[in-house]
Amino acid sequence: MTDIRLYMLQSGTLKCKVHNIKMNQGNGADYEIPVPFFLITHPAGHTVIDGGNAIEVATDPRGHWGGICDVYWPVLDKDQGCVDQIKALGFDPADVKYVVQSHLHLDHTGAIGRFPNATHIVQRSEYEYAFTPDWFAGGGYIRKDFDKPGLKWQFLNGAQDDYYDVYGDGTLTTIFTPGHAPGHQSFLVRLPNSKPLLLTIDAAYTLDHWEEKALPGFLASTVDTVRSVQKLRTYAEKHDATVVTGHDPDAWANFKKAPEFYA
């Protein structure tokens, strides 16, 4: 039987400016942020959360992403794609049961369509928005990453089915956290022998967002962004959860990375 574990992995980095991550801060200073993704192993089948950058940007960033590379430049080695990293841990991509998407921005879609037996779980509002984003958000969605034939999708419906229990045993719970993107969701991971871990993903890029010291440099709704952080703070306190923010280079350094794991 497979143990229930959480692996924290990284799909390269993004080079940008401080103000791209922390609104109106940094005076134009350069900033480099990690691109995390996660693997949950489970006897019922494994889950990949997000998958990071698409492997195509390792060889042709501008060809795959286009003009957004002028703002966010991906740094990714050819062996840092999510499939290769999961294989390197000794897991078969065919055993991945779920690919769960926090949202569909370009640095979170690296797993879509790359695991042959996976059901892809996403908020319906996010999926629909990704095909017809507003002008200011269009560069963040790379349609060829998620508009692929033959994919099996499972759609969640915001507050209607909030706190969805993916496995039915409490291991992985979704939390609807719109704001950064219209259909963003965060996750609570419960493990047999560790404190719960709250994966904010991009609901809180950094601890500055979490502590309400800064707004993120990109968001779809300021009000929703702020209220989603408040929701997560309450939820984290209720569950005594360790908070894992989305792209904080300082905080991310403090967590165990694969091949180490949380169990």
UniProtKB/Swiss-Prot annotation:
Which keywords are on file for this protein?
A: Hydrolase, Metal-binding, Plasmid, Zinc
**Zinc in keyword set:** yes
User: Which NCBIfam families did the record assign?
Assistant: AHLLactAttM
The domain of life for this entry's organism is Bacteria
Give the E.C. number(s).
3.1.1.81
Q: Which reaction does it catalyse?
A: an N-acyl-L-homoserine lactone + H2O = an N-acyl-L-homoserine + H(+)
Q: Which family does it belong to?
A: Belongs to the metallo-beta-lactamase superfamily.
Q: Which GO terms describe its molecular function?
A: acyl-L-homoserine-lactone lactonohydrolase activity; metal ion binding
Does the record bear Metal-binding in its keywords? yes
Cofactor: binding details: Binds 2 Zn(2+) ions per subunit.
For the ligand (Zn(2+) 1), the binding residues are 103, 105, 180, 202
Designated name of the protein: N-acyl homoserine lactonase AttM
CDD domains per record = AHL_lactonase_MBL-fold (cd07729)
Q: Which organism is it from?
A: Agrobacterium fabrum (strain C58 / ATCC 33970) (Agrobacterium tumefaciens (strain C58))
One Pfam family of this protein, by short name? Lactamase_B
Q: Which residues bind Zn(2+) 2?
A: 107-108, 202, 247
Q: Which cofactor does it need?
A: Zn(2+)
